[in-house]
Amino acid sequence: NPVKDKININKNVDINVYNYIGDMVISKRNINTLDVSKLSSGVYMLQIIYENKSITKQIIKK
């Protein structure tokens, strides 16, 4: 499902967002809501870091 404005996460995490060419476009620490409203439409990689573990997910910004 495409994301429009915000991404909600159940726990406080560190998040890095990368564009399609690998440039980091957002980096936030200790958050549970990520505002993506200012990102251009497209595909991004979302790196979620929690308790020294890293998970990467693809998101589509609408």
Q: Could you tell me what each predicted segment is?
A:
Residues 3-62:
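C-terminal outer-membrane/trafficking sorting elements
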